[in-house]
């Protein structure tokens, strides 16, 4: 094989590895990808504090024994699954820890700029310790609803349009 063919294969391999691994390449288990999805769908339209607060709730749950011990486990936790018409297992509407996961809509981010920001936040959040701006919150909800479970918890902070509890 001549040098040009080898060089082309190396460049092609690098490019394929770079582009195909962009979403998952930075962590083997896809934990940052899962966290980025949650930040995107729960707080993508909020300033940095709102995005970090959502990430903190997930981390607080990961560190608590009553929840799964991974970011993906916490985010995709659901009480009930059903079989769709295509034969796939899908979460039952209203039975998920985070509403976007079982709302029946696509889980593919549509706004690429917001997605990139959420992905960068998730990557650095998982790698580095952060001051918990939620004061240990394990739950939150939007300020325009009042779920039944909120009355039994202690409110910690109000950040952007979310109210946080522990």
Show the residue positions of the predicted features.
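N-terminal secretory signal peptides that target proteins for export/translocation
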Residues: 1-2
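Bacterial extracytoplasmic/cell-wall-associated proteins, especially those involved in peptidoglycan
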Residues: 19-166
